[in-house]
Regions:
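Short beta-strand/loop motif that positions the catalytic acidic residue
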Residues: 150, 155-158, 162
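C-terminal catalytic histidine-bearing segment of alpha/beta-hydrolase fold enzymes
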Residues: 171-223
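Catalytic nucleophile-loop/oxyanion-hole region of alpha/beta-hydrolase
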Residues: 18-25, 38-74, 199-207
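Active-site nucleophile elbow and catalytic-triad environment of alpha/beta-hydrolase enzymes
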Residues: 131-146, 151-152
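Short, small-residue-biased leader/transition segments that mark boundaries at the very start
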Residues: 2-8
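Short substrate-entry loop that stabilizes the transition state in hydrolases
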Residues: 11-50, 87, 115, 163, ...
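Primarily recognizes the serine-hydrolase "nucleophile elbow" in alpha/beta-hydrolase
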Residues: 58-122, 138
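Conserved alpha/beta-hydrolase "acid-adjacent" motif
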Residues: 163-172
Length: 223
């Protein structure tokens, strides 16, 4: 395949990187299925909220700018993110310049909303820093409010018993996508909690892989 899967991973609430089961392990699987997989080691915000998205946009620009050289289809570049990395992937999908938006997104149990009743407190605190009560920024990074007609097709994967990032985050994002007529699918597994990524011991490990493959075929990224 000439498609490029752009893999961003971060868990730990914009505080650290989970580079294995939510980074390199994912990338290896996508690569084994014909994708060029890129794992982005982006900078932590430390309260400077523009830093992660700036790094993500730069990565997209580099990938698309080298598409011909790397034998990639510049119109099949996707983003994958988990937890806080899912928030970054959704930020790229909604807030980035048009040229840097992905063509599809796969979000695992993402942080979406920064509303206090819904959010993951650590992600909000670490991204916004001293601006944590700034309503304009809270609204900006409540990404269900930023979905528009240019937001890419999205697959959401999560567990009903997630006690870290409330499932309502994904539901809000799916609803916003649906309202804008963006093709979207949401799969909520009955168990698994948070942070399972590509762990072999996740009960629905094989089902996740099957769903991803079928969805990528359905949206015509793969044959």
């Amino acid at each position: 395949s000439s498609a490029a899967s752009d893999v961003y991973k971060r868990q730990g609430g914009y505080r650290g990187l989970a580079m294995n089961h939510e980074g390199h392990d994912m990338a290896k699987w996508y690569a084994s299925n014909g994708f060029v997989a890129v794992v982005l080691k982006y900078r932590m915000p430390e309260g400077v909220h523009t830093i992660p998205l700036s790094d993500a946009e730069k990565a997209m620009s580099v990938i698309r700018g080298n598409a011909a050289k790397w034998n990639l289809d510049a119109n099949k570049v996707g983003v994958i993110g988990s937890s806080a990395g899912g928030h970054l992937a959704a930020s790229l999908s909604t807030l980035a310049a048009d040229a840097n938006r992905p063509d599809f997104a796969i979000l695992y149990y993402p942080v979406i909303s920064f509303d206090n009743m819904t959010t993951h407190g650590g992600s909000k605190k670490n991204l916004l820093g001293t601006d944590i009560e700034n309503k304009e920024l809270v609204d900006r990074y409540s990404l269900q409010k930023q979905v528009d007609d240019k937001t890419p097709k999205t697959l959401l994967l999560l567990s009903d018993d997630d006690q870290t990032v409330p499932p309502l985050n994904s539901i809000l994002y799916y609803t916003a996508l649906n309202e804008h007529h963006i093709p979207a699918s949401l799969y909520m597994f009955p168990s698994g909690g948070h942070g399972w990524g590509f762990r072999y011991d996740f009960t629905y490990y094989q089902e996740v892989k099957d769903l991803i493959q079928k969805w990528l075929t359905y949206i015509k990224i793969t044959d």
